[in-house]
Swiss-Prot record:
May be involved in cytochrome c oxidase biogenesis. It comes from Homo sapiens. Its main location: mitochondrion. Keywords: Disulfide bond, Mitochondrion. It comes from the Eukaryota. This is COX assembly mitochondrial protein 2 homolog. Coiled coil: none annotated.
Amino acid sequence: MHPDLSPHLHTEECNVLINLLKECHKNHNILKFFGYCNDVDRELRKCLKNEYVENRTKSREHGIAMRKKLFNPPEESEK
C-alpha cells in the first residue's frame, strides 16, 4: 500500500515513477497480478522511502530549532 500519490506531494523523480506504474497497470491489467509491474513498483517504493526519510530529517531539525528558540530565548541586553 502506498501513501497518497497526488503529484503535489512528491518530487519530480517520484512523480515519473508513479506515472510509469499507473501506465503499467493500465496497459497490463491482468499481468499486473502476476508481477509484471513489480520492478517499477520496487523503484517507486524506494523513491517514496527516500522522500519520507528526507522529510522526517527536515522535520526533526525544524523541531530542534523551534525547541531551542522557545526554551532558550536570546538574552536581552540590559541598559
